Amino acid sequence: MLQSIPGPQHILKALTGSLGLSTIFEPDHEASQNSFQCSKPELSCHAQYHGQDTCCFNYPGGQMLQTQFWDADPAVGPVDSWTIHGLWPDFCDGGFDQYCDSKRRYSNISLILVDSGRADLLEYMSDFWKDFRGDDEDLWEHEWNKHGTCISTLETTCYADYYPQQEVVDYFNKTVEIFQKLPTYQTLANAGIVPSHTETYTLDEIQAALAKAHAAPVTIRCRNRALNEVWYHFNIAGSLQTGTFVPSEPDGLKTNCPATGIHYIPKKHREPSRTTDTPSQPTTTGTPFKGRGNLIVSSMGGRRGCIISRGKWFASGTCATFKAKKATDDTFTLQSSKGICAFEGDAFSCGPHVTAPEEFSVQDGKLSYRGNTTFFADKAPKGRTQSTIFASQDEHLIDLAITWKERR
């Protein structure tokens, strides 16, 4: 269990009489001691909502997902551990709310934890709750603001003697607590599934190992046929702070991994071979897009529409014509009738609001951005709907690739 010392928030409340002095040195910080007491907790997604106190019944986000990352290139976190992604309150049918309370959107998570006497928690998060871009604080802020604010039992009114940002501490503390009980790396290793540059595994092998440890199936996510994420699903009897987490079946979207040939890439770099029969071939970039053409989207094993002039993914109608202009020998820029194109705020967009064009390249015939040929979206467009394309995976569930169809 993580150890803590009283922070300024606790000391201030003790001195002003809001907390007894004896309580500020209480070593057990696994859950808030002044959160709402629930006499007869009901299990979320099993009991029907009929007006229960949502301080004791997680609603509407009653399906809790503890999500973990395996980032191998670039390597993120310890070589023998997965890292934390977040704790997400899904609806029982797989949908979800996001950014539920603008008044509780914080940008100082580290300071909040330290001021609450949880420097121990911050230290652990700095090792195991990692952002692949290197900005851990930004990831923590994103997870709280997008997901934490949507957990009903973390509302400030659910505390008998609330101190500022107490619910933020509870969110990160509970996420770490659940993560520590789900050692994905060790669970897979116990089943003979270990990172390797040569071995591959089946989806059934991976699912069997993780489901046995979790006591319920899990959601397994891949990127370019390689293990990338695991989602553990729970329902909760009572509040997030003090309730019982019960393993549950996955909701909503299932795995995107192939049935066989799944790679589990080591985080540490491959050691060079001392002897080789033939020299290795360097990776080369493809011929840059040029002239005028369409940006064709492929996803889920087939062609799925194209990109229209403002940079959105569209499945119906006419594809936009883009101009590819040479930037260097290996790179080029893109422009539509609306204007130049770039990733702004991680989202692909074209228009007069874009101030500087992005440089792209080609790998294996696919559009490449910063070395990646896989892009992401929240959903595949249908009918007249359009979808935003993102450069990083984050929590975007659809993988896609973009190719060029030259127009003459």
Curated annotation (Swiss-Prot):
SUPFAM superfamilies hit by this protein: Ribonuclease Rh-like
Broad EC category: lyase
Composition-biased stretches (Low complexity): 275-288
PROSITE patterns: RNASE_T2_1 (PS00530), RNASE_T2_2 (PS00531)
Chief localization: other
Record InterPro entries: Ribonuclease_T2_eukaryotic, RNase_T2-like, RNase_T2-like_sf, RNase_T2_His_AS_1, RNase_T2_His_AS_2
GO MF entries: ribonuclease T2 activity; RNA binding; RNA endonuclease activity
Enzyme Commission no: 4.6.1.19
Protein name: Ribonuclease T2-like
Gene: rny1
